[in-house]
UniProtKB/Swiss-Prot annotation:
NDH-1 is composed of 14 different subunits. Subunits NuoA, H, J, K, L, M, N constitute the membrane sector of the complex. NCBIfam families: PRK06076.1-2, PRK06076.1-6. It comes from Pelagibacter ubique (strain HTCC1062). GO terms for biological process: aerobic respiration. NDH-1 shuttles electrons from NADH, via FMN and iron-sulfur (Fe-S) centers, to quinones in the respiratory chain. The immediate electron acceptor for the enzyme in this species is believed to be ubiquinone. Couples the redox reaction to proton translocation (for every two electrons transferred, four hydrogen ions are translocated across the cytoplasmic membrane), and thus conserves the redox energy in a proton gradient. This subunit may bind ubiquinone. It is a multi-pass membrane protein. GO terms for molecular function: NADH dehydrogenase activity; oxidoreductase activity, acting on NAD(P)H, quinone or similar compound as acceptor; quinone binding. The gene is nuoH. This is NADH-quinone oxidoreductase subunit H. GO terms for cellular component: plasma membrane. Signal peptide: none annotated. Keywords: Cell inner membrane, Cell membrane, Membrane, NAD, Quinone, Translocase, Transmembrane, Transmembrane helix, Ubiquinone.
């Protein structure tokens, strides 16, 4: 009976985390469309529900009732597994995201490493989908995605090292508490900018949406997908975008900490501050999508390997030297 209670409690915790994440994905899709429409001086979704808030629900119902077509020449098992892998990896990453000192599903001591490892695995779902489709456009999109994500993961990893040098811990709550007096966005602002741009590339967002460039590759690795399988790729993509916004808020914006430690700001729950910071970063994501044209593939690779990687490595040396010289290193 005790085991059943433990299983029930853990299942409840998982659902309590995943359901809000999935609802948030639906809401940010609506927000993404509204921001894009605002920049282009049009209304965007405004028919289904008040202010068009139920548009994502209508889209979900449409995908549920659409036929799932599996190409006859595809590798059917891998073709079906690909969107499942993509969505699952995007959702399990949220297990270690803290919304306060206690509001976290798994408060592990290697939270940053876990996040980096799981988010890096996301490319496998895209590669599987592109290869299993047995079609040239999905395959080209998958190759592009693999090269792009691997390139920018290196920069993100080096940026995380900058933060870890200042904290001395891989625990996400420790990283947040280390910013109690000063958010890391101030001393590490160049790293925040590189992290933000790398996160755009990591999540295949414009101007780095080359794996699904409509003018060149139809829909890239998603070309042969339809119905709920296509929707699962879509859910995984937006869950990853939210995850990168959460990572940015934890690493640079103090996570669930109040920006001003004064009344009445310190009365607001930490989870609310965390949500506000995630939304702020997502609005920046959406504005970039609306105003910046797509990069060429060679420009994307050059930016990652010739500019971001050397700059982030240089900043690691500068950060370590500064902390060592002033005896501020958090480790003995």
């Amino acid at each position: 009976m005790e085991y059943l209670n433990i299983i029930f409690l853990q299942t409840y915790k998982i659902l309590f985390l995943l359901v809000p994440v999935l609802v948030s994905v639906a809401m940010i899709v609506w927000l993404d469309r509204r921001i894009w429409a605002f920049v282009q001086k049009r209304q965007g979704p405004n028919v289904v529900g008040p202010f068009g808030l139920l548009q994502s629900l209508a889209d979900a119902l449409k995908y549920i009732f659409k036929e799932v077509i599996i190409p006859s020449s595809s590798n059917k098992v891998i073709f079906i597994l690909a969107p499942i892998v993509t969505m699952t990896l995007a959702l399990v990453s949220w297990a270690v995201i803290p919304f306060s000192t206690t509001q976290v599903l798994a408060d592990i001591n290697v939270g940053v490493l876990y996040l980096f490892a799981v988010s890096s695995l996301g490319v496998y779902g895209i590669i599987m989908g592109g290869w299993a489709s047995n079609s040239k456009y999905p395959f080209l999109g998958a190759i592009r995605s693999a090269a792009q994500m691997v390139s920018y993961e290196v920069s993100i990893g080096v940026i995380i090292i900058n933060v870890l040098l200042c904290v001395g811990s891989l625990n996400l709550n420790d990283i947040i508490m280390a910013q109690e007096n000063l958010w890391f966005i101030i001393p590490l602002f160049p790293m925040f900018v590189i992290f933000f741009i790398s996160a755009l590339a990591e999540t295949n967002r414009p101007p780095f949406d080359l794996p699904e460039a409509e003018a060149e590759l139809v829909a890239g690795y998603q070309t042969e997908y339809s119905g709920m399988m296509y929707a699962m790729f879509w859910l995984g993509e937006y869950a990853n975008i939210l995850l990168m916004c959460a990572m940015g808020s934890i690493l640079f914006l103090g996570g669930w900490l109040s920006p001003i430690d004064l009344y009445p700001f310190n009365l607001i729950p930490g989870a609310i501050w965390m949500i506000f910071k995630i939304l702020f970063l997502f609005v920046l994501f959406a504005l970039v999508k609306a105003v910046v044209p797509r990069y060429r593939y060679d420009q994307l690779m050059r930016l990652g390997w010739k500019i971001f990687l050397p700059l982030s490595l240089t900043w690691v040396v500068l950060t370590a030297s500064y902390l060592f010289y002033f005896n501020l290193l958090p480790v003995n």
